Curated annotation (Swiss-Prot):
Organism: Methanococcus aeolicus (strain ATCC BAA-1280 / DSM 17508 / OCM 812 / Nankai-3)
Protein name (record): Protein pelota homolog
Nuclease found in the keyword field: yes
Top-rank EC class of the record's enzyme: hydrolase
PANTHER family associated with the record: PELOTA, PROTEIN PELOTA HOMOLOG
Keyword Nucleotide-binding found: no
Record note on domains: The N-terminal domain has the RNA-binding Sm fold. It harbors the endoribonuclease activity.
Amino acid sequence: MKIIKEIPEKNIIKVMPENLDDLWHLSNIILKNNAVSAMTERRTEDKGDKLRADRGTKRRVYLGVKAEKIKFDENTNRLRVSGPIIHGPEDVPIGSYHTIDIEPLKDVSIQKNWKKWDLQRLKDAENSAKKPKIIVVIMDDSDATVFIIRDYGVKEIGHIKSRLSKKLDYKRQDQENINYYNEILEVMSPYEGKILVAGPGFTKNNFQKYLSEKHKDMLQRVVFESTNHTGRLGLAEVLKSGIVDRIYGEARLSKETQLVNKLLEEISKKGLAVYGVDDVKNALNYSAIETLLITDEFLRKNRRILEDLINSVEAIGGSSIIISTEYDVGKQLKALGGIGGLLRFPIE
């Protein structure tokens, strides 16, 4: 995310999202009734020909809408903000409905009552863009799954199946192993920076040996770790363990995973945790909240209630973390009511 311009007296910040993560951050910053302005395509009627209602010309115009619907669409790589037009060219009717498609590398101006956590989120997104992509390969002797870890969740970018069979002779087995490793490399190679390869058993060690013999330049970029599981279970194990943070520095999704798992652990032993709005409010009365966890969905639907809670937590020196429901731990927190708190000390 690039913060291009700030106009504090008008509560306007102009930004340029650079990737999908930035669009997701903006989907949590832009709220209903916020003013969103950008260059956009708008179909205007051809006044010279009234015979055909479907005629008109699409042209690029700069206009603003009062946000009514905000939809993050990972598949089309855009954030759609719909609402009545509040300003634009003279020939565009004020109050008519329009959808602005916010896409990477296109400027957008947002006018709203900026909260402290909104500004922090912009700053986090700005810093995140400077970090390399986090690539994790979970593999064993039958298949390998390659994931890219984003701020808002995980995307599978490759799944490779081994064609190794015990029915093959040793020479054919060696060749199938090489084919398997090369297919994994083909998915890994385009990404810069460190790559984490993890999994149970010895296959990852054999892959490491293959890299040391044939691809020493790639070996320097790869870190190998052990897990008990493959696939998404193996990935969850990696995120929970903190390995990703040790390799890449603090990663948002890894931090979220560890915090929600800590919350679940404390709940299971009736320890330093509460969940649900009423219990969180009660813990705040004792100034006991150390870390407040809220899902992005719950925040969007209950902004006014949660603003007071977040401010109260910050007033006692605590912190608030917004958890993405695009990934498993966010869904777990959602099942608890969308809100929970880690405590400084136990309360009755």
